[in-house]
């Protein structure tokens, strides 16, 4: 059995060399402490938006490679594979193989394998000492099957919102190096303001799998007054900020994109079926100011590091995970903007609270068939 006390040997020196931020060093220290107890083999790092979880993962991988161990890093979507590889290479990790059909970086012998959960579901999973699961709250079946079958492997989960039902039945422990409030206070995340011009009436919308029915929610949000309010509020208060908009479903998000275009605002639409080339083009146009409002449903809730200073939330939800993920897309500090402006047309901030007030200290241990108190399962991206 691998000696977990020495798995990350040399991390203190690496932390100084790479100038990790204090909360990143603390994340590695807490992880070492948890795994060092002996009984914990599956540990989640609760890593708020902006904590730098990819860099933290890089240091974990470096420590594992120093001991001659193989690592699998799983991403929640194929679209995130290349940026993950680039991030690892930027920190000096070169022995990387990508598990994806016809990918130029395919190398089964590489010590570090990067794969999407969709690919893992169709492939034989290679041997590894450590599996790092990004966005582990999404609870991919292939990962959880591996967790129950591979008792010789250590699993490290990464998530800003590890609050999904039943996670505590699979994972042994969760460590929390910092909170969103901590990162805002220390200047690593942006201050934010919330303006809620509309509170949609959701009383007649049924609940499915712990969240509002998507189609019924879209009907509520497609009302003429609400549709007009979204555009008018941004024109009055949005200050022409680079903006991400979240719609209730694809049709609703497309309608809002068209409404912004009619108002003379450069807009783009992106969903799970937008190919990687078009998505890269949208990102480039967004970064250089050619697109002011990028509309989606859930595609842009994770793995997006765009220079956003306004969030339009037009998608009511009961999910604190989804709520925090959406607002988190705009909390990174951007040059030239003082804060994040949240235009909440969904009533989510009033219903669920401000993201600085939402926090969990333990993993949920709700048994199958029982109702979790306040959380629905977030959907995996379609790829």
List each model region and its residues.
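Conserved pre-motif I regulatory segment
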Residues: 2-46
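Walker A/P-loop
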Residues: 37-61, 246, 270, 295
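Conserved strand-helix element at the start of the C-terminal RecA-like helicase core
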Residues: 45, 54, 69-81, 216-263, ...
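Conserved helicase ATPase core of P-loop NTP-dependent helicases/translocases
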Residues: 82, 96-109, 252-302
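Conserved RecA-like P-loop NTPase helicase motor core
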Residues: 116-123, 139, 272-364
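Post-DEXD/H (motif II) to motif III coupling segment of the RecA-like Helicase ATP-binding lobe
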Residues: 135-195
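Conserved interdomain linker/interface between the two RecA-like ATPase lobes of SF2 helicase motors
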Residues: 174-249, 368
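A conserved SF2-helicase RecA2
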Residues: 175-195, 204, 208, 334-383
């Amino acid at each position: 059995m691998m000696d977990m006390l020495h798995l990350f040997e040399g991390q203190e020196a690496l932390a100084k060399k790479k100038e990790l931020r204090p909360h990143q060093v603390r994340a590695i220290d807490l992880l070492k402490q948890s795994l060092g107890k002996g009984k914990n083999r599956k540990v989640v790092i609760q890593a708020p938006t902006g904590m730098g979880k990819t860099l933290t993962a890089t240091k974990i991988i470096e420590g594992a490679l120093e001991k001659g161990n193989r690592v699998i890093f799983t991403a929640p979507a194929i679209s995130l594979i290349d940026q993950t590889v680039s991030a690892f290479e930027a920190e000096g990790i070169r022995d990387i193989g990508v598990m994806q059909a016809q990918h130029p970086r395919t190398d089964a012998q590489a010590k570090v394998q990067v794969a999407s959960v969709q690919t893992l579901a169709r492939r034989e999973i290679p041997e590894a000492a450590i599996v790092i699961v990004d966005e582990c709250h999404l609870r991919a079946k292939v990962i959880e099957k591996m967790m129950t079958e591979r008792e010789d492997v250590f699993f490290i989960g990464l998530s800003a919102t590890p609050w999904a039902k039943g996670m505590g039945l699979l994972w042994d422990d969760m460590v929390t190096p910092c909170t969103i409030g901590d990162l805002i206070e220390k200047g690593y995340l942006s201050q934010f303001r919330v303006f809620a011009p509309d509170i949609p009436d959701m009383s007649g919308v049924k609940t499915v799998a712990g969240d509002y029915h998507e189609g019924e929610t879209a009907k509520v949000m497609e009302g003429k007054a609400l549709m007009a309010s979204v555009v008018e509020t941004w024109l009055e208060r949005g200050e022409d900020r680079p903006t991400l908009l979240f719609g209730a479903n694809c049709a609703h998000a497309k309608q809002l994109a068209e409404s912004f275009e009619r108002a003379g605002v450069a807009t783009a639409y992106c969903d799970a079926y937008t190919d990687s080339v078009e998505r890269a083009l949208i990102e480039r146009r967004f970064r250089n100011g050619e697109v002011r409002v990028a509309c989606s449903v859930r595609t842009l809730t994770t793995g997006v590091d765009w220079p956003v200073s306004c969030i339009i939330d037009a998608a009511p939800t009961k999910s604190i995970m989804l709520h925090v993920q959406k607002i988190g897309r705009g909390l990174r500090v951007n040059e030239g903007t003082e804060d994040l402006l949240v235009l909440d047309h969904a009533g989510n901030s009033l219903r669920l609270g401000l993201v600085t007030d939402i926090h969990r200290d333990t993993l949920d241990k709700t048994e199958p068939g029982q109702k979790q108190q306040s959380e629905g399962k977030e959907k995996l991206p379609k790829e």
